[in-house]
Regions:
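N-terminal accessory alpha/beta regions
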Residues: 20, 27-132
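A ubiquitous short alpha-helical element
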Residues: 69-72, 92, 110, 156-159, ...
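Short amphipathic alpha-helical interface patches used for protein-protein assembly/oligomerization
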Residues: 36, 152-156, 409
Length: 441
């Protein structure tokens, strides 16, 4: 990698195989089917990135099923039905990067139905995020500041002229736009006054003029009769904003401990693109930095990445009710993040309890039909010999990342296993899904 140009394009003409395709798909979406891996390998990096970053039309079958699930969530008021609707989108949408980014921002603007207690409000927020997921962060931040679920979550109705509530002002600076250390307590106090009167009425944003403080406030060294919109704009103008976003993007999509130099380079690109995410993401996913060998198989899969990635590759059709439960057991209950900080992820995904649950997941996926049957594509590999089976499963599930010692153990296991071809395949799959290497991407 050219140290002077760390985000220089990766030369895919000399190094694009199923390994690079697998790396991209595992980071930019929730895993892949064998057919998707073949397509990305054959089409190349540029065509694959265009398909991922540009909006693709959804199929008629997808739209029909998605609409039905959405209506079921609304009519029943069931948060579990809303979870099934979103999981279905994550698995079957023609725009998987959009869904991955919707989860990224759901975690960034972490809002829990445990307090909001409204499927329509949570649905509206999710669709608002999706609309702006790969677009203009400025618009997204403005939209979230007026979002009904967010205002309930951070006590907007309690923010009144005589008794300002600092919750939203604090979180927009600490968690949404700037990060710790880039504001003062006085900035928060003054900004809270600017958001007074930003309430919810009849399920909609309502600026309660009688409860809004119209007097002058001083935030980030600037003084004026600011309202909430002005505070959002002031946050977006701070030089720490692109850097804050760069850090989160790098840790989510590239490596757990990016260097300060790399963060600075990425922040400069975010600033260059005026906080527009789509061109930034394309540069990131085509960069030498992204494809460096040391940045592959280094991120711990979140429960969603682990579960959906496994289902994408192995199972069809999927039974969603069991998926909701296992995600909650593994610690990633969508629409119900643990706090305003969201899921911190990384090494925190791995505990003695979660390791046992991940091992149980491998067993349930391969020895029961709790989540659905093995797909026809997967079952078909039983017609091959042990070496061919290990090779194809290694390509689909491990990106050929394991060393030869582990590969030989897998070969030995399959060759010596007793039972039918299907039983031997399931045993091998269970072993692969239990490997430490499978917990990484």
């Amino acid at each position: 990698m050219d140290a002077s140009k760390p985000l220089a394009p990766y030369d895919a003409t000399t190094g694009w195989t199923h390994r690079e395709a697998s790396h991209l798909l595992s980071r930019a979406q929730f895993g892949f089917t064998p057919a998707e891996l073949d397509r990305a390998t054959n089409e190349g990096m540029d065509a694959t990135l265009t398909r991922l970053t540009e909006v693709q039309p959804e199929s008629t079958d997808f739209s029909r099923a998605e609409t039905s699930l959405r209506q079921a969530a609304i009519s029943t008021g069931s948060i579990d039905n809303l979870k099934i609707w979103w999981l279905y989108r994550m698995r079957y949408s023609a725009n998987p990067l959009t869904e991955k980014l919707t989860l990224f921002w759901h975690n960034h603007f972490a809002t829990s139905n445990a307090k909001v207690n409204s499927v329509p409000y949570m649905l509206r927020q999710n669709e608002l995020i999706r609309t702006n997921a790969a677009g203009d962060f400025k618009q997204l931040l403005h939209s979230m500041s007026r979002d009904t679920a967010m205002l309930i979550w951070l006590d907007g109705n309690a923010n009144r002229k005589r008794h300002p509530n600092e919750n939203f002002a604090r979180e927009i600076m600490e968690l949404f736009a700037l990060g710790v250390g880039n504001y003062t307590e006085r900035d928060i106090q003054e900004a809270a006054r600017a958001f007074t009167g930003w309430h919810v009425r009849d399920g909609q944003f309502w600026k309660h003029e009688l409860q809004h403080d119209e007097s002058a406030k001083t935030v980030f060294g600037k003084t004026g009769p600011f309202d909430g919109n002005d505070i959002v704009n002031l946050c977006l103008e701070q030089p720490s904003c692109p850097r804050f976003l760069a850090t989160k993007l790098a840790k989510t999509f590239v490596c757990p401990e990016p260097s300060q130099d790399m963060i600075n380079h990425l922040a400069n690109r975010i600033h260059h693109h005026d906080l527009q995410m789509r061109p930034v993401l394309r540069e990131l996913f085509t960069s030498q930095w992204f494809y460096q060998l040391e940045n592959r198989q280094i991120l711990i899969k979140s429960p969603l990445e682990l579960v959906l990635g496994s289902l994408q590759t192995l199972v069809e059709p999927i039974r969603w009710t069991g998926v909701i439960k296992v995600l909650a057991d593994l610690g990633q209950n969508i629409f119900e993040p643990p706090s305003v900080k969201g899921w911190e992820g990384g090494r925190l995904w791995i505990t003695s309890s979660s390791l046992l649950q991940r091992a149980n997941l491998a067993t349930e996926l391969t020895t029961t039909n709790q989540f659905g049957p093995l797909s026809e594509t997967v079952r078909h590999v039983t017609t091959d010999g042990s070496e061919a089976i290990v090779n194809v499963l290694g390509r689909w599930l491990l990106s050929d990342s394991v060393d030869d010692t582990i590969r030989q153990e897998l070969l030995k296991f399959h060759a010596s296993a007793e039972g039918t071809a299907d039983q031997k395949l399931r045993g091998l799959l269970q072993l692969i899904l239990s490997l430490p290497e499978y917990q990484l991407h």
